[in-house]
Amino acid sequence: MSGMGENTSDPSRAETRKRKECPDQLGPSPKRSTEKRNREQENKYIEELAELIFANFNDIDNFNFKPDKCAILKETVKQIRQIKEQEKAAAANIDEVQKSDVSSTGQGVIDKDALGPMMLEALDGFFFVVNLEGNVVFVSENVTQYLRYNQEELMNKSVYSILHVGDHTEFVKNLLPKSMVNGGSWTGEPPRRNSHTFNCRMLVKPLPDSEEEGHDNQEAHQKYETMQCFAVSQPKSIKEEGEDKQSCLICVARRVPMKERPALPSSESFTTRQDLQGKITFLDTSTMRDAMKPGWEDLVRRCIQKFHTQHEGESLSYAKRHHHEVLRQGLAFSQIYRFSLSDGTLVAAQTKSKLIRSQTTNEPQLVISIHMLHREQNVCVMNPDLTGQAMGKPLSPMSSSSPARQAMCSGNPGQDVALGSNMNFPMNGPREQMSMPMGRFGGSGGMNHVSGMQATTPQGSNYALKMNSPSQSSPGLNPGQPSSVLSPRHRMSPGVAGSPRVPPSQFSPAGSLHSPAGVCSSTGNSHSYTNSSLNALQALSEGHGVSLGPSLASPDLKMGNSQNSPVNMNPPPLSKMGSLDSKDCFGLYGEPSEGTTGQAQASCHPEEQKRPNDSSMPQAASEDRAEGHSRLHESKGQTKLLQLLTTKSDQMEPSPLPSSLSDTNKDSTGSLPGPGSTHGTSLKEKHKILHRLLQDSSSPVDLAKLTAEATGKELNQESSGTAPGSEVTVKQEPASPKKKENALLRYLLDKDDTKDIGLPEITPKLERLDSKTDPASNTKLIAMKTVKEEVSFEPSDQPGSELDNLEEILDDLQNSQLPQLFPDTRPGAPTGSVDKQAIINDLMQLTADSSPVTPVGAQKAALRMSQSTFNNPRPGQLGRLLPNQNLPLDITLQSPTGAGPFPPIRNSSPYSVIPQPGMMGNQGMLGSQGNLGNNSTGMIGSSTSRSSMPSGEWAPQSPAVRVTCAATTGAMNRPIQGGMIRNPTASIPMRANSQPGQRQMLQPQVMNIGPSELEMNMGGPQYNQQQAPPNQTAPWPESILPIDQASFGSQNRHPFGSSPDDLLCPHPAAESPSDEGALLDQLYLALRNFDGLEEIDRALGIPELVSQSQAVDPEQFSSQESSMMLEQKPPVFPQQYASQTQMAQGSYNPMQDPNFHTMGQRPNYTTLRMQPRPGLRPTGIVQNQPNQLRLQLQHRLQAQQNRQPLMNQISGVSNVNLTLRPGVPTQAPINAQMLAQRQREILNQHLRQRQMHQQQQVQQRTLMMRGQGLNMTPSMVAPTGLPAAMSNPRIPQANAQQFPFPPNYGISQQPDPGFTGATTPQSPLMSPRMAHTQSPMMQQSQANPAYQPASDINGWAQGSMGGNSMFSQQSPPHFGQQANTSMYNNNMNINVSMATNTAGLSNMNQMTGQMSMTSVTSVPTSGLSSMGPEQVNDPALRGSSLFTTNQLPGMDMIKQEGDGSRKYC
């Protein structure tokens, strides 16, 4: 600098001056008196020199005293000498350095002119200079990278135009510092130098296309970037030198590193002014705008909405109540209220208001309010799911163990928990989630009950995770994550609770619950039911006594953290509840040992209790309980709706705890556990029901009353224990009066409904019907529930007025139509609660004994159940009731069979368990459909199978899958109507084939619905995918196949596919054959009644589905269904599921007959069965039938030959049954006994075959390996591996191998067990998929071509190409992505086909469903066209290159299908 130059230009002079001036500087000197001015200026230069010298050194900071001029000058001279020496050395070495190509290390190497630009480029920020007027004198070009402004745009522009208004003062302080240079720097003040570092917010230029404006106009224009500025003031000495420069601030600005960014304050506030009527006249959000926290506008909006919205169960909104207090007291604080932001963040808010009076007249003029907001951290966004078991604890603290805590956190923790529960529940998968998370949730009592399911917890957890993760939000499992999942919204209101999954509205239950639940006003209660169920489940898992009471307890409790943990907080809430549930709560856990009778009672009573809780309007439910007794008969229709809302969870809950929780349910939320699992399914349904209730009822109070009636009726009827609940509810009812909330609630409901799309609407309506049935039977057993369901239909028969009311309320549901479809169901149901209980007891006995003979009542109940199930598949009641019922059944069975209630068998196979909770319900549906006769027993049998087949977890898994299917079906039941209608064409042929065909038809329909339902709930793909991996690990290929099927179709479908057959195989024996025949007949009638179905669909608002159902093309139906499902829940599982259903179906559609498509793809299970019969028949019916007969014969022969006990046996049995059934479509007369015998024979055969196949698989593998090496035709390899397939392969060996599989219908059954067996034994991972494949070798040689035609034929073909028969299948060539998945994909696709023939058929499906491509492949043989011929015709396929990709040409669609399956896998 000039100063430095002056002082140091002459070192000798400087030294001299220093020596001479040192003494003088220490004190005044007369000699210098005349040079005072020069001295002052010299001092300035010295100070500046000191700063320059020490600028790059910290030495100055080490001085404890101000360094004197002598020291400063001495240091200056020292540094100048060093610099000169370095420059000399650099100059001396520069030539050598450059010659040696070594970068110079001398400081003087960099050119002075280049240094500046280089430094600017290296800057982690931009450089700008501001003059005293605040104008930007210079800014570097890279400012565009930070603020999107061009250099020209900022030059000569006021810096304050880009600075946040809140930072102007700070910037001015730095721009105009107190004289830092004129002697003030030595005062000891911290800023000794004129350099400073400070943070400021700079405006980021809005995008030119206003992309951001679309999101938030204001925020888009006011987006600020926090910059860290290092500023240096231009030395005044320059100006004093006479230069024409102004003092300026030189700054380097960079983004503040995340780690250095100060944590944004969690508290925010904004101010409003209201007139004396409480209307907002002014809104000041400047403080929040200045804070620049993301989402502040949404925060303000939602806060005002929450504050001024009237909530159900409350006469006044927070704002009105607070306004009255302010006018009365002059100053008031509102209670803390909570809500959630669009991103799910929970916010706790409190408003402080003051009345402002005129200074002159002292008259009140206005009210000023400060709204203080605190954002709560998202504690468990998706982690609870992921943490699964850990979740139990988190949930326990947050949601399950202490809804009260939740309540404390959110005020409506119950809601939140319920939400989480609901979220789980919303997807059938979530139900499974619940089951697995239950353990995880600990609070998922129902799931815990389904501990066996919990065995599936790993799977379930996976499922749950997947389900949740999408969910997303998966708030499904999020009960444990009350904060995030149970967004404040959830907590805030029952409706809010509904939003955990998709924070507010994915399941609209939140919104809808918000409204309806709000109507009940036990925000917590509405979710309370869910919450209760969750709490109960959690408490159960934790061993705590959870009381629905708290949730049920009054909304007051809920509001005031009344949802105190159902477990821990129970007593207080119960106290508030008036001990409504306190007994029940603890009774729930205290009296779990009561007998089944107690259970039945508990089922009813807990249902009643839980219904209120479960219902979105728990409070109203509770209140209505008290009033419900008197008013119960006044509006039974709406009561039914409310019961639906309340019972669905209840049904689920009781089912999980048939024995141990029977009393718990009775006394407490014993039924809660069930709701946890059913929440996902019932949430939407309830949401729809609530929506309808809102429409039907004039006010929340009415809803509350209705709820009371709905819950009170059953509750009061079933047990007096609910009376306290009634009281509590009654307490809440006063709060219910809020009618203003109706508009908002309706809006929310409508809004959420939109999200639910068509299916949810269907579901609620159906669900309402289900509710009717549910209230009566909260029993654990599906049969009981079904019976109740029937009862609900019965009510139609019994109390015509009630039915009429219900029909009126549920016009869309067309209650009358459902009964018409299933007249038997109603007649069966006419029995009162006593009959229901009797039926329940019978079912319990069936479950416990799993004896083929069931009480007539039980059988009727089962029949009704199947009918009802079938009837109500659309309602989704099955999904809920059946799932719940199924769960109870499975649980019960497992409890009896496996020492553990459910864990023994289910735990052995995590999938088994999970599929059971979620899939069991479906199983119930499918079982009831597939095993209509065996419905209850089938379910039980399924459970029993699980219990008996702990090692073959997959077999139980089949049932589990079935359960899932049933649950899904229940959830899907709504779609099922449409699906049934859609698939009637496909299903009709099936029916034509045989009763099994009917079953198949139902199952495909259910399956079709299942995917959509799953998608709606959680998305089948997630579960599917999760299932697939577990399948890989599972040693039970066929069971796995069903699971895959479920994954493909939607876990639920699997169960349909395989579980119905499995159930039929074992269950026909266990169950009186008459039931199966009757159920089949009923199913046939119901399915045949397309008009009724169509009407129901129309009532459900599914004209599209109806039209689709009318369409004869199953392809369309399946694809449409999948599409619809995807549309309904595309976000949840659109890709996976859509691709699976659409792609797989689409692929199948082109590849297979439409029938095949419909049945094979969507209904995987049914499809395969149907397809081989109807599907193949249309294409090559003649061949298929003979093939079927041949296959049947082969199956028997092979079964005898190959007696290998394999889980696939069950699948195989079902396959055989399917085969037999398809083979015996004309054998419809065959009674259940005959079928049972056949099934037994088939099972034995399959056992033998599988043993043989296992042995053969090794051989086949070796042969396949050799064959692959030799390109042996599958037939060449098949002979060893495919005794049954051999016959078909014999037809066209290369093609025959493929074709045999189309004919392989039977062969597939034969080989299926063998393949399955071989596959299963060969590799657990492979076995899940390979099970279908049969043996990798077989698959490659035979199955491969067949498989290739099958859904994943290409994948399989490539897999075969892989070389390892087993691993080649696994090899991802076709499934590329999924080496293991390829098995799963194949399995899945195969499952699609396999789904129908779970074991044998699953393999068969491999072969037939394999695409009917196999059949197609065998098209030349069988006449199946499309894929098959292409593949078969493909020389590569026919030739030794069975495994070559040449098979792919005809298999492209299959490959797509496979890909789709992969997605699901």
Curated annotation (Swiss-Prot):
Compositionally biased tracts (Low complexity): 638-648
Location of the motif LXXLL motif 2: 690-694
Motif (LXXLL motif 4): 878-882
PAS domain segment(s): 119-183
Modification comment: Acetylated. Deacetylation at Lys-780 by SIRT6 stimulates its ability to coactivate PPARA.
Listed GO biological process terms: cellular response to hormone stimulus; cellular response to Thyroglobulin triiodothyronine; cerebellum development; circadian regulation of gene expression; circadian rhythm; locomotor rhythm; male gonad development; negative regulation of DNA-templated transcription
Protein name per Swiss-Prot or TrEMBL: Nuclear receptor coactivator 2
Organism: Rattus norvegicus (Rat)
